[in-house]
Amino acid sequence: MDAIRNGNFTSSEIFRLMKSGKAKGSWSVDAYTYIEECNRERRLGRSIEVVTDARPLSWGKCVEKRAFDVLGLEYTLCSDVTIQHPTIPFWLGSPDATDPIAVSDLKCPLTLTSFCQMVDPYYEDHKLVHEGLTIEAVRENHKDGDKFFWQIVSNGILTGRKKGKLIVYVPYYEELEEIKSIADGNPDYYWIWSADESKLPYLIKGAHYKNINVIKFDILQRDVDALTTRVLEAGEYLITV
């Protein structure tokens, strides 16, 4: 992970600042915990995060290459680039992709349960009907829905985009061979390359679900203002080392 992220607020964790406490207008315990974690990283000069189960992360990194092949050329993959807010230096993010009007976050869940929780509200009679719904369905239906929402809002602010996209991808069975080819030779992905196909998440082509699901929404000014205000307030608690 890019060292510049250490000790700063990042899009992937910024949802923690938006949690409210029990009293009206108060902050949650998790918000204060996040600020303290950033301060510890500042004192340590390194990340305090220790990944105990790297498989969900490595699956996502491996499979995103295939996902963007499926999505097409309108998207620019930028997940390895860290963007800093132009006037708030302790606010950073690494969006997965951008296109001319939107910023996108790609989710490649390792479990089919997580996939279904994200996309089920957008299906009706075996048809994808997400155009008539909003990101709110994910926020209500998935345990990390609020995290996904604020991550995209944050990256929208950092990239100057007014629209967000949550892209949810699970490969069809026929795509697993290509994914194993991507994994071949990379020690981080060895478990993917060596796994029996039945042990990997995949969909049956022509059944209920599509492999690519794009959920679009407007990034509202009220959310931009609320997040910006909260980041600035939280920044007052960051130490200088």
Features from the language model and the residues they span:
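Charged, glycine-rich intrinsically disordered N-terminal tails and low-complexity linkers that flank
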Residues: 1-62, 66, 118-142, 173-181, ...
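Compositionally biased, intrinsically disordered low-complexity regions enriched in proline and serine
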Residues: 33-35, 76, 238
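Secondary-structure transition/capping residues
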Residues: 50-51, 166, 238
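Short, well-structured hydrophobic secondary-structure segments
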Residues: 55-80, 90
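Short alpha-helical scaffold segments that flank and stabilize functional sites
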Residues: 63, 70, 100, 158-159, ...
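Nucleic-acid nuclease catalytic cores
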Residues: 74-95, 99-230
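Charged phosphate-binding loop/patch that engages nucleotide di/tri-phosphates or the phosphate backbone
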Residues: 228-241
